């Protein structure tokens, strides 16, 4: 991860969907890809190659109607889903699953995100927030992503 400027990291700032794709793309050495998968990802945007490369590998998905919403803050359950898809792309184990029923808001995890969130908790990538909350629809911060990526890289040898 890089800072938002040369000398500012902004750990408490929210992370966007495009930023997640850019981080994962950078981990893979910034491979080329010029196939535009989404109507709202302009070829001139800084995230064009990262988003389209991640989409071509099944790491990220759109939000409907051919869009990606690159500048929207990523939710914690979306982030868990993207990281699990990235682990699968790497050939890593994605079968781990923690019992998340102990979190006060476990029932609010979307059905499509159940397995990714359980996997992220099992792998030590995601932990609760104050109040014993998993906060699946809460936005992920840059600090949370930094910790998740550190743990991910240790778990998957990146």
Predicted regions and their residues:
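Feature responds to low-complexity, polar/acidic, surface-exposed segments characteristic
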Residues: 2-50, 57-77, 85-113, 127-140, ...
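Catalytic cores of secreted/periplasmic or lumenal enzymes
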Residues: 117
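Alpha-helix C-terminal capping/helix-coil junction sites
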Residues: 55-56, 121
